Amino acid sequence: MDNKSIEEYLGFGSGAVDGLGIGGLLKVRVEDFRVEEVSSIPALDPKGRFTVVRVTLVNWETNRFLKRLSRACGINRNRVFASGLKDKRAITTQLLVIDASQKKIEQVDIADSTIEILGRTHQKIGMSDHDGNRFTLTVRGCCDVDGAPLEGKEAMRRVLDLIEKMSEKLGENIFPNWIGPQRFGSTRPVTPEVGRAVVSGDFEEAVNLYLGMKGLNDGKETDELREMWRVTHDPAKCL
């Protein structure tokens, strides 16, 4: 199974509607991908224990930034609360709640980041507390199927045509939630198979699939281990 057949296996071989695409590349530059978290600011109170901030990050992996921020504030990483992880190669904006004084946070200076203090609160935030994310994408190098460059106006015309067709087929302002192969396993799409077995209550099959399914880039040792599991289902023989 190669990369193309994996995409077809996962159902990525066709579009939601028929129409001409625009080709092109995403994330050529960091500023080509922008993510703005849509969330409500926790109730503010000057006597609150926590500080609420809005951070804008440029090319930062979220967890790495949170660790860097906690060190700068002199606190444990577990005292910095976020609602979600954002793309690294992007400009991202999101809320954080920090268990540190406003004065301490005002002194923080981390490269490629902006920290806007919103106030104090008694409330923490947890994963997925936000309402959603707003994405702004720049597509560069748009081209036709034969590789011929597309003018910006023609590319936009095609995009608007596809949006109109999707509105007719799916409903107004409804857009398919496209999920790339990486969510399923880009070189070993085992996740949907294991999930199907778990949902069916066949946990033994879920384990067999997880351990035994071949991967596109498995090394010799891993490939032999998976084959041994498929043949014997014996952990001792696989070690």
Feature locations, PLM:
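Ser/Thr-Pro-rich, acidic low-complexity intrinsically disordered regions of eukaryotic RNA-binding
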Residues: 61-68
